[in-house]
Amino acid sequence: MSHRDTLFSAPIASLGDWTFDERVAEVFPDMIQRSVPGYSNIISMIGMLAERFVQPNTQVYDLGCSLGAATLSVRRNISHPDCRIIAIDNSPAMVERCRRHIDAYKAPTPVEVIEGDIRDVTIENASLVILNFTIQFLEPGDRQAILNKVYQGLNPGGALVLSEKFSFEDAHVGELLFNMHHDFKRANGYSELEISQKRSMLENVMLTDSVETHKARLRQAGFEHAELWFQCFNFGSLVAVKAGEQA
């Protein structure tokens, strides 16, 4: 059961860096719905993208799966024989709850939930890979390498879904969308104190890139086709397709 996010409703004397610990995992569904505009749309559309791209006898990877929302969306929308979903997260608290969520919804497609570092995972025979608000928590120097690995592990015709919070090269646009995102959080019941304290904890661990930077990395990895398919304020999602025909 998800609880309402009140983690930052009272002043915290010493704010450390953000971690996806048990306290965050417990309120995460409420937190992300109230903090990330368009999150539900992205999750449901990932299921539709899975219908289009997932092939029989292949694997789907959900890298940085948190509580498994994207995995469950994929699973609801595919029924291919000999298909498998591999969901990976480095937070023990998230992995434990993700396994519970997966077990609660029975479906024919098997899911393996792994506690581990996505930088160490071997990707192979993939028809779909999901990086849903994950890259922004990696060290900038590690980001190109994970995209290179995804590209190499995708079958021809396979796709990567890359969702992120964005920064903007145009400072005026960046400020407008930043302020609109804060309006969104206020409208969802977060106080100025909650918004400020969470931002302070995230600022050293969540380092955002522009859409242009993401596209440049995807091109460098080898993706011939990459485009923004969804955006709400300073959050959005790209889809990148590896050239070639699906088997």
Curated annotation (Swiss-Prot):
Keywords: S-adenosyl-L-methionine, Transferase
Catalytic activity reported: prephenate + S-adenosyl-L-methionine = carboxy-S-adenosyl-L-methionine + 3-phenylpyruvate + H2O
GO molecular function term, any single one: carboxyl- or carbamoyltransferase activity
EC code: 2.1.3.-
InterPro entries hit by this protein: CmoA (IPR005271), Methyltransf_25 (IPR041698), SAM-dependent_MTases_sf (IPR029063)
PANTHER family the UniProt entry points to: CARBOXY-S-ADENOSYL-L-METHIONINE SYNTHASE (PTHR43861:SF2), TRANS-ACONITATE 2-METHYLTRANSFERASE-RELATED (PTHR43861)
HAMAP family registered for this protein in UniProt: Cx_SAM_synthase (MF_01589)
Protein name: Carboxy-S-adenosyl-L-methionine synthase
Organism: Klebsiella pneumoniae subsp. pneumoniae (strain ATCC 700721 / MGH 78578)
Upper taxonomic lineage: Bacteria, Pseudomonadati, Pseudomonadota, Gammaproteobacteria, Enterobacterales
